């Protein structure tokens, strides 16, 4: 459970922003969304493999020299 201590005379907005930042750093929202519905192990493997292929092609594309535009 994530907790933050609200300092004296600290506005609510600032405390809420700090809380959201800590939640984002821990990755709790992404994990919560992933666990919201059951995903079959085969579907999970397929999704992760597709993401890895996409990352690979993105890395290859960024390493290539740009085409000449003349």
Swiss-Prot record:
Which Pfam families does the UniProt record give?
Answer: Ribosomal_S21
The terms describing its cellular component in GO are:
ribonucleoprotein complex; ribosome
**Gene Ontology terms describing biological process:** translation
Q: Name one GO molecular function term.
A: structural constituent of ribosome
Q: Does the keyword Ribonucleoprotein apply?
A: yes
Family, as annotated:
Belongs to the bacterial ribosomal protein bS21 family.
> What protein is this chain from?
Small ribosomal subunit protein bS21
User: Source species, please?
Assistant: Leptothrix cholodnii (strain ATCC 51168 / LMG 8142 / SP-6)
